[in-house]
Every structure is written in C-alpha cells, then in structure tokens.
Amino acid sequence: MLLFAGNPHGSYEHLYPFVQENDNVALIILGDLQLSSPDELDKLAKYCDIWFIHGNHDSKTVAAFEAICGTHWKSRNLHNRVVEIQGQRIAGLGGVFRGQIWMPPNKPMYFDPIHYCQYSPQEKIWRGGVPLRHRTSIFPSDIEAIENDQADILICHEAPKPHPMGFRVINQLAEKLGVRHVFHGHHHDNIEYKTNFPYKITNVGFRSITDIHGNYLLKTIDDREK
C-alpha cells in the first residue's frame, strides 16, 4: 500500500494510525520533514517503509539537513532518481526554485552545484559545496538527471501548473517521464486539480495523506500561529 504524506513540519503522530492499521505500507513524504534528529523516522520505520524528498524547510538549520542527508536516511531520499516501490516507478524532485539559482521561466543563474561553487567566493562555500540554504534549491542538472527516464509517478515539493505558484517546467518533466500522476507538497492546501493533462495532479497539503489514486485519507488545516 502506497501512501503520500504532505509537509509534516516536525510532527508525525498523525501518520501512525494509517501505518499501524494497514499492512505493507510504503510511506512517501513530500518534503518539509523539518526534523532535528533522525529519531522520528527511526520510530515510524517500525511500522512502514519510508521514502521522501526534501523541501525548503529541510535546509533551514544544520540539524534539519543532517537528520535526512547526514544519516542512514539519505539512502531513502528519492531526489534525482527513479526507484521502483511496490511495483511503481517513482521519480523524485526535491527542493524549491530560488532566484539566486533558477527561477523558471527565467534562465538559470547556475547549471549545477559545481558551477555555483566555481563562481562563488570562498566564504559562501559550506562543507565543500553550496551553502546550506541551497542544498534544497533546484538546479537544472536535477531535472536533467531524470528527464530521460520513465516513471509511473512523479513526486515533487514544488507545484506544477495549474497551481497559481506552480511551474510549467515540472509539467514538462512529467510529460517526458510519461507519468500518470504527480504528487506535490510545499503548498498547504489540499487540491486535486481538474486539468486536461494526460496525468493527474494532487497537492498533498499540510500534515495530510492520500493513497496512490489521490484520494485523501486525512486533510489537515494549518492553523499554526504565523
């Protein structure tokens, strides 16, 4: 059973009823895990097979970044690759577009992290690479890494069109991959879009859950104080 979870933002209690009451669950988290350690994932993994992509909040702090990218959990990040999970080929594109790197439809400032580092002063280099913030920025090379593959499902943190803040370049990636469904996080609403695209698009919002068909099993409203 494949489940898609949107934007946990550090809270995971809402997931337990779904992974404990169903057998053989693969849980795919669509970014913004916002952890301070891998402990939450370690506990949740007793009940399900966890996969994820990173979101913009996953490089807000060193601890958030290290929890998923500096531990054994980094092997479960689907960013930049296509992995077969329960018979479904799932392509992952984590992170967000940022103007300092690439804000489609504008031309990119840098093609890949190496290009960025070549033209950056030494004080901007972090641990031999791009700054912490840009560890969750999308480069053109991220899309190039998977666009010639084939997949059944594309998961991404950013939204495609027709979301008002979506990006056509994600639709183009979905078309190249030949997917039948795109699941995205980032935006905290729950939307199943009505489009003329040859694939479905589902926005899995704040602490919400859908099944593989995009049916909402849990819808949560973000009522946190701003």
Task: For the regions a language model picked out, list residue spans one by one.
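Binuclear metal-dependent phosphoesterase catalytic core
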Residues: 14, 83-86, 172-176, 181-226
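Active-site neighborhood of phospho(di)ester-bond hydrolases with catalytic His/Asp-centered motifs
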Residues: 4-7, 27-32, 51-57, 77-79, ...
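A basic- and aromatic-enriched beta-loop-alpha substructure that forms the phosphate/nucleotide-
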Residues: 49-109
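Metal-dependent catalytic neighborhoods of phosphoester/phosphodiester hydrolases
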Residues: 15-17, 33-48, 59-73, 166-168, ...
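N-terminal active-site segment of His-dependent metallophosphoesterases
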Residues: 1-46, 59-60, 148-150
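Short amphipathic alpha-helix with an adjacent loop that forms part of the alpha/beta core around
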Residues: 15-22, 84, 142-148, 218-220
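Active-site-proximal segments of metal-dependent phosphoesterases and phosphodiesterases across multiple
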Residues: 9, 13, 34, 136-178
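Active-site-proximal loop/helix segment associated with metal-binding centers of metalloenzymes
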Residues: 88-158
